[in-house]
Amino acid sequence: MIPMEPTPSEPTGLDFAGTCDLAIWCKLLHDKGWSGPRIARAIAKSEGYVNNLIRVVERASPSIMLRWRAEQSGLVDHVCATDWLVAVCLLPHDRQDEELQRRIAARPGYRV
């Protein structure tokens, strides 16, 4: 039997810099027509987790997305926990930004 070569439509061996990158990839694949279960199988995560990441990317304010992305590089302290993002992204963008500032200010010795 001849081994199958991976097709360009299947992401293989991708390394993600962090959860934000993973979420953006999930959203991209979803926009390309992949179902939640298919994405979940491809990245070995639960369908619920994948759907939550997609929802965060769809609903997060630009400030939240920029902060979340910056946290992956280690330039700022981590405040964008996934469970917090899922909850806060149900709010309007101005409220999301207020909650982000409140969360940053609540950290002891925080770096903006």
Question: What do these predicted regions represent?
Answer:
Residues 2-24:
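Short, Lys/Arg-enriched anionic-surface-contact patches
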Residues 19-37, 42-109:
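Amphipathic alpha-helical "recognition" segments
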